[in-house]
């Protein structure tokens, strides 16, 4: 046929059988990738430390999506929440991966069958005997079926009526587990961080889809609308489908980057805004203050802070710190976290408590500045020692650790104090193992960042595709030069402009 690579899809333009075949093959590829990727991730995943080396630190991409839908156990005998499992059942991580691969194989065979047996009676218009598709009717069928799936997911899977529920956690990502969720029918259901909204919105959207599907199955479109929107043209279907996909991609890019109940931080890592707003730092200070109010010592209050909460309050877990083109997991960047050293409290020689100014997200380097409780600069690590007035040596800054591995340890050596002041810029201080993975010390993004970048990029690309194919189908007659309502037989090549008898070529 001699088609250029960018026009090869025209072979299925008027061939419903093979159009179906290539879509089944596409499903086979998607399901096959998902299953294969899951098996690869399971082969490299280390489940031994869910607190300091969770899935998102290891760069897992598909495991978090399985987990949020209720899969927590492995046939390897481990659970995502830690501990061992004796009877994981068929729906383990490996079970889901295997089912996708089996499904992919079946779709592959079905695609081959439909490619070979393309000329089926079901695709023929009995009035003309030519292949044709009743696109408005097919739209109704698909809308109805997707509505049933959506409704069923909300009613059965999410609520636990027939299914495991979904991953639910507290606002600080400490107590997450899979559990049934009751639908939230009040105004709280519109809060993106309320899990009940997931159930209620799937039920509502599914109901709407079922009703809309039945409507489109039972009511034919008016002729003017049918012609105006080119409802008989398969490229109209392509254009509107691309619109649905790019809209969904934009939505999920937003819910992933800004955070929501559908993207728990235990599975995908914290958001950048939680670092920017000092979200975890405030909660840690609140807990310490509550401990002090109960007459606990500073050491006891800090020792009660969960290591998991302290780990979230570390800039290396900020997805915006990794460059877009730095390959590898977070563990390949700053290393595998081994333990929390504790919270450093700095004091000057007058006994004032000093706080290290934290590094903003988009800085690679940042001056080390220590301020007091009123925000007044009291000490720093100067760039020019000759000009310094607030150096650690001049101010006499000392340091003591509370909680963590160095609980109760104090330092007065200026070199050591400055070392920990620099590290305190990055949040809570952790011991990191860079040797095991040969980590290079350069921050990486989490799967939250990759997902957002990928979906935002493809959404922009698909937006262009929607405009392109929408314009092609709406203005096909203009582009082709043929009036779509032209009854006369057009001889291709007879005219310089297709269908325009005033431009008949001269016979030489």
Swiss-Prot record:
GO terms for molecular function: chlorophyll binding; electron transporter, transferring electrons within the cyclic electron transport pathway of photosynthesis activity. Gene3D superfamilies: Photosystem II CP47 reaction center protein. Binds multiple chlorophylls. PSII binds additional chlorophylls, carotenoids and specific lipids. Its main location: plastid. The gene is psbB. It is found in: Plastid, Chloroplast thylakoid membrane. It comes from Jasminum nudiflorum. It is a multi-pass membrane protein. InterPro entries: PS_antenna-like, PS_II_antenna-like_sf, PSII_PsbB. This is Photosystem II CP47 reaction center protein. PSII is composed of 1 copy each of membrane proteins PsbA, PsbB, PsbC, PsbD, PsbE, PsbF, PsbH, PsbI, PsbJ, PsbK, PsbL, PsbM, PsbT, PsbX, PsbY, PsbZ, Psb30/Ycf12, at least 3 peripheral proteins of the oxygen-evolving complex and a large number of cofactors. It forms dimeric complexes. GO terms for cellular component: chloroplast thylakoid membrane; photosystem II. GO terms for biological process: photosynthetic electron transport in photosystem II. HAMAP family: PSII_PsbB_CP47. One of the components of the core complex of photosystem II (PSII). It binds chlorophyll and helps catalyze the primary light-induced photochemical processes of PSII. PSII is a light-driven water:plastoquinone oxidoreductase, using light energy to abstract electrons from H(2)O, generating O(2) and a proton gradient subsequently used for ATP formation. Keywords: Chlorophyll, Chloroplast, Chromophore, Membrane, Photosynthesis, Photosystem II, Plastid, Thylakoid, Transmembrane, Transmembrane helix.
